[in-house]
Amino acid sequence: MPTDLYQGMSDFYNAFVQRNRDYKAIATELIDLFGDQQDILDVGIGTGLLVEQIIQLRPELQITGVDTSASLLEQAQQCLGTQVDLHCQDVVDLHLDKMFDLAYSRGGAWAFVNDGNTILLASHILDLDAIQQSFERVAAHLRDEGRLIIISSNANHGKREELDGEVTFERTVSKDGIEGEQYLILDYRCHRNGGLVGHQRVRMRLLDLDRVEEMLVAVGLGSISDHHNKYHIYQKKGSE
């Protein structure tokens, strides 16, 4: 099981992202893209803030969420109760006793980010072969003509928020290049009364859109829409 990068920071992280993401608006747009699909997989569900909004709008949906962070899943359990089936699993080794109509990720495993004029995939999974395997495992859990949606994120920009009179939460962003590979470095720092009380560093692998779509095609997922680079949608080939 990968290291839980958010252990000890999940409460602060939750408050920070609630202030910086309009989950109701994202949920409304996603539901339009879901159409009549019923069995949904959230890859990297985190604390469940997005799913909370989705099930308020579409309580009949059957949603399963996976994440590698036990601390974030604990918050998701408190938020969602028994409405969502939660699993502490790495998507690289995903094994669920269920097939899905649709899967999506918004930064929990992968997200697209706009780097000026270039669209890049930001992946929590760092090894290229492991990224390919994660795509394969999701595709294996999709029914024929099922869809994968990878959502764009603004997490590649720095941000600082005062959560209350004592606590400040900050995200700083940098890039690193190692032997031709590109990485996005996200540093989350929490200060209380000026003193540092928590710090987590998250490193994400960056890949060009064309390369990512070649990898997805290799597991039977072809691009059908990008909704102005906001929601990249891939569909699994049906049985011939």
Residue spans of the language-model regions?
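Conserved class I S-adenosyl-L-methionine
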Residues: M1-G35, Q37-G46, L49
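Class I SAM-dependent methyltransferase SAM/SAH-binding core
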Residues: L49-D93
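Mobile active-site "lid"/loop adjacent to the S-adenosyl-L-methionine
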Residues: A111-A130
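SAM-dependent methyltransferase
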Residues: R147-M215
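A short glycine-rich, Lys/Arg-flanked "PGG" loop and its adjoining helix->strand segment in the class I
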Residues: H124-D144
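C-terminal lobe and adjacent flexible extensions of AdoMet/dcAdoMet transferase-like proteins
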Residues: R211, M215-E240
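A short acidic, Gly/Pro-enriched loop at the edge of an enzyme's catalytic core
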Residues: H95-A103
